[in-house]
Amino acid sequence: DLKVLNTQVQNYVTNILEPMLTMSYHLGNDYPHEAVDEIWKLLFENAAHDSIGSCIFDTANEDVYMRYKQVRDIAVNLVELHSRLIATKIKNETTNEITLTLFNTLPQKRKETIVFETYLPADNFAIKDAYGNLVKYTVIEKTDLTDYVLSQTIRLNPSKKIYLPSVVYHAKIAIEANE
């Protein structure tokens, strides 16, 4: 349904993408003005007629859907890129730890359970907050992908040693996030 898609895409752009880009910009990364302008242009093109009310022909309906898909694809890719750019700017004092970064794109503090998927290089691990305190977590499900992942490893520079874990798990984890 185009109404649902319209709401989902606009909420993603205003509540996730734009705050993420603003955080990234404040850390010294470029703000992608042209891409954001293109996103809003595509959204306004869809709002220019009765497409959301389903009062159009099938071909126009397909065009509207494709514009929403374009917006979603651009927005998701920008969030992915800028979340990585932000995460690389966060200092990790210990060199032997893997960093997990959660983002709050809303203007108020939050306390809620966050469920995410990640890859784990060990069976036992700890999650710590920014202050070094242990964070309680629950592993909802875990799949051993060691053979698959390690057989897919590509070395861009064979002269450099790369980190290869002894095991690799794909896991769904729930944590209680505060702030």
What are these regions (language model features)?
Residues 1-179:
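Carbohydrate-active enzymes and regulators
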